[in-house]
Amino acid sequence: MAMASASSSSSSISVIIFLLLAPLCLSREPPSQIPNGTLDLSLLWYGQFTPTQKERVHDFIESLNFDAKEGLDPKVSAWWKVVESYQERFEVKDIYRQKKSNRTVAPRIKVKVVRSYVDEKMKYGKELTMGNGEKLVETAIGNMSKVVPVVLLSAQVRAHGVGFCDGTCQHNALAKIKGQKEPRRYIMVSNPEVECPGECAWPFHTADKGPRGMTYQPASGEVGADALVIQLATGLADLATNPDLTKSLFKSETTPYNDDVKKNHESSSMYIVDPATKCTRVFGSGAFPGFTGRIRVDPITGGAFNSHGINHLKFLIPSIWDPKTKSCWTPM
């Protein structure tokens, strides 16, 4: 009996220690189901951003659902439809069947910004930590109950200490918010042009690792603006496709091009390869390490792009894993 009691006590202590040390802000425990319907975003601009950077992010988000006949192809919305197609494979499969047909149709995920808040003075400091990261998520949520908080960090904020600049400058995760029963899903991205452009601003800046390849001019004219879009697109795609489901989907498949990301997580049982992360640094067909793949260059501005959005704007967006073809889907 004494031995059993000691064992039970030891187990309890282990659990308590685990709970105390487990980071809340960067938890990778996934949500229970794929979001569908409307994805309401609440943006927190933390630090100082240029007008171009803010406009670029808003224009990209608005372009996700812009699939009108007018405008040039390929469109950003075609990329977002690949994200939406993940719903055909899982829980919603039997719900969205076309009338008089057995063919399933993925419901649209409408994305819109419902709140935009600016903190240029950086209330919680210029260095991101586990503690103030959680506070930033709370600030982005405000008093809204059904939004996805998106925290955008300016180039003045140092985020390397929480895992940014290590192959990526974004993450989507769950944060436990004070006063709420369920943890909240959120996205956090940073402008890498000062802290680590070689990690997160390629192909607009020379890569720090691997083949350097060719660099291009950003379509907006600002490296920070277009790098933010790439990071935000990655976070949105990975969040909207539900990591819990994609983990099993990719279990027996190889990960193209992102060996560095995989090596950094080899010791973690929680490592999840998300759809956009799986195709990191792939922007067009025929891509290989150091080469973006097939993209276009605007003959007037010299800006690189692979898709079009609202008002004929040009964007360079990351490739995304297509579960139907089991390959990286690219606009070109």
From Swiss-Prot:
Coiled-coil regions listed in the entry? none
Q: Which residues form the signal peptide?
A: 1-27
Cellular compartment(s): Secreted; Secreted, Extracellular space; Secreted, Extracellular space, Apoplast
Q: Which Pfam families match?
A: Phi_1
The positions flagged as glycosylation sites are 36, 102, 143
**Cross-referenced InterPro entries, in alphabetical order?**
EXORDIUM-like (IPR006766)
Indicate yes or no for the key word Cell membrane.
no
Keywords carried by this UniProt record: Apoplast, Glycoprotein, Secreted, Signal
Q: What is its main location?
A: secreted
The free-text function statement in the UniProt record for this protein reads: May play a role in a brassinosteroid-dependent regulation of growth and development.
**Entry's family note:** Belongs to the EXORDIUM family.
- Put simply, this protein is called Protein EXORDIUM-like 6
The scientific name of the source species is Arabidopsis thaliana (Mouse-ear cress)
Q: Which gene encodes it?
A: EXL6
